[in-house]
Amino acid sequence: MEKYQYITLREKPELMDKAAAWFNSKWGVPKEAYLECMEAYLKQETELGWFLCLDGDQIVGGLGVIENDFHDRPDLTPNVWAVYTEESHRCQGIAGKLLNLAVEDLRAKGISPAYLVTDHTSFYERYGWEFLCMVQGDGEPDMTRMYVHK
């Protein structure tokens, strides 16, 4: 039996408020912004989903998929964003499994490639992501790295 449970928010919609608060606490994006995206996903208004890793009833990892992760290249869509694993649960493959689940989910829906904005180097390459180009983040002074998963 797997130590952790990996789910989409559609599998446990009752976690929406808790998940929005969790993502807000990690990234500082308003909880309402997460709720709006999550509600659209749960109402089947979008196929761009939310993926969580649970340790018992605690969220220990998660990510979402949205149209645009606040950058100047709207043609590079959809974007995996808000990738986070609790420090106490890192180095166990949680983020990698969540990334793979998101890419597999998108492919199953006929959506490919997927994109991701990050300042990290080398981490995402382990999971099949390739550096594509530099993009300008909304309100950001410096360019940031855009990756693609084909």
Q: Language-model segments: which ranges?
A:
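Short amphipathic alpha-helix that is part of the acyltransferase structural core
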Residues: 1-37, 50, 54
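Short loop/turn motifs at secondary-structure junctions and domain boundaries
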Residues: 41-47
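Short hydrophobic/aromatic beta-strand or adjacent loop that forms the aromatic wall/cage
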Residues: 48, 141-146
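Conserved beta-strand in the GNAT
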Residues: 50-52, 58-68, 79, 84
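Active-site beta-strand termini and strand-to-loop segments that position acidic
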Residues: 54-56, 149-150
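Helix-adjacent hinge/juxtasegments
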Residues: 69-77, 81-82, 87, 92-94
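Conserved acetyl-CoA-binding loop-helix of GNAT-fold acetyltransferases
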Residues: 85, 91-104, 116
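Conserved active-site alpha-helix within GNAT-family acetyltransferase domains
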Residues: 108, 112, 118-142
